[in-house]
Amino acid sequence: GVIPCGESCVFIPCINKKKCSCKNKVCYRD
């Protein structure tokens, strides 16, 4: 929830679902 993963989840979910979660249309790690 703090560190950006460099992914966006506007149209598709986060690619790295195990480490990253979607928040505010951006994927964050933890």
UniProtKB/Swiss-Prot annotation:
Biological process (GO), any one: defense response
Cysteine-cysteine disulfides: 5-20, 9-22, 14-27
Keyword terms, alphabetized: Disulfide bond, Knottin, Plant defense
Post-translational modifications: This is a cyclic peptide. Contains 3 disulfide bonds.
UniProt keyword annotation of Disulfide bond present: yes
Cross-link Cyclopeptide (Gly-Asp) mapped to chain: 1-30
Signal peptide, first to last residue: none
General function of this protein: Probably participates in a plant defense mechanism (Potential). Binds to and induces leakage in phospholipd membranes, particularly ones containing 1-palmitoyl-2-oleophosphatidylethanolamine (POPE). Not active against Gram-negative bacterium E.coli ATCC 25922 or Gram-positive bacterium S.aureus ATCC 25923 up to a concentration of 64 uM.
Domain commentary: The presence of a 'disulfide through disulfide knot' structurally defines this protein as a knottin.
UniProt record similarity statement: Belongs to the cyclotide family. Bracelet subfamily.
Listed name of the protein: Cyclotide mech-1
